[in-house]
Swiss-Prot record:
Binds 1 ascorbate molecule per subunit. Binds 1 Fe cation per subunit. Keywords: Cytoplasm, Dioxygenase, Flavonoid biosynthesis, Iron, Metal-binding, Oxidoreductase, Vitamin C. One of its GO terms (cellular component) is cytoplasm. Gene3D superfamilies: B-lactam Antibiotic, Isopenicillin N Synthase, Chain. The keyword Cytoplasm applies. InterPro entries: DIOX_N, IPNS-like_FE2OG_OXY, IPNS-like_sf, Iron_ascorbate_oxido_reductase, Oxoglu/Fe-dep_dioxygenase_dom. PANTHER family: 2-OXOGLUTARATE (2OG) AND FE(II)-DEPENDENT OXYGENASE SUPERFAMILY PROTEIN-RELATED. This is Flavonol synthase/flavanone 3-hydroxylase. It catalyses: a (2R,3R)-dihydroflavonol + 2-oxoglutarate + O2 = a flavonol + succinate + CO2 + H2O; a (2S)-flavan-4-one + 2-oxoglutarate + O2 = a (2R,3R)-dihydroflavonol + succinate + CO2.
Amino acid sequence: QVPVVDLSCPDEELVARTVVKASEDWGVFQVVNHGIPTELIQRLQKVGREFFELPEAEKRSCAREAGSVEGYGRRIELDIKKRKGIVDQIYLSTWPPSSVNYRYWPKSPPDYREVNEEYARHVKTLSEKIMEWLSEGLGLGREAIKEVNGCWYVMNINHYPPYPHSDSFNGLEPHTDINGLTLIITNEIPGLQVFKDDHWIEVEYIPSAIIVNIGDQIMMLSNGKYKNVLHKTTVDKEKTRMSWPVLVSPTYDMVVGPLPELTSEDDPPKFKPIAYKDYVHNKITFLKNKS
């Protein structure tokens, strides 16, 4: 099973070691007793469900525009028999303040913005703590990873309607996360699977737990010490599956490569430095061509 880390443990060094070990061996773990109120998580899920229950025309008032990362959109995916499946998504930048564009934030339900902003504050604190532990696990100062990867936060909701042919359709195809760190809440419908030891493992649903994925940027910063977990999502035949990822990344103009302190003649860099925007462009182009 995917490691579960209890953040209420009074021994912070033990917690940090557990997070580091999970990031080295799995590239994914779940955290419980993380300090984000259960009631807030329930409200976050409630307003997310209510938004996706709105008529399509009303959701389109938040539609993503050409060239924008943010906003509401619908992806039509084909299963292996060329039948259409639907994935609805909304992306909202929450940090830094200069990146926030309320043009894309839902006006309904009325408390959507308040709840999402409160959750964004909590999850930023949690992600910074995790990045501090990961930096220390590399023998570096606490700020090392955060200074590069903790610069841009985007909140996302994935909404996967029921699909009768779910055995032949992935909500998201196998991939590693393009960003550095992803913190995910899901509803009770299973579907997230991670690849380890040559087989797919279903991530156990734990109410109010947060799933943490190591992505490409932290893998590169660590010169490969931390794994970028390969994962996919499945859909349910009868019930709607939803997830609430927060994507933590560098800003587009930042250049990312192995941290210099981690490389030497005996341990040369495994990755070439590259601007994050170029990395994103290259990977998206590759995935499009692959599909």
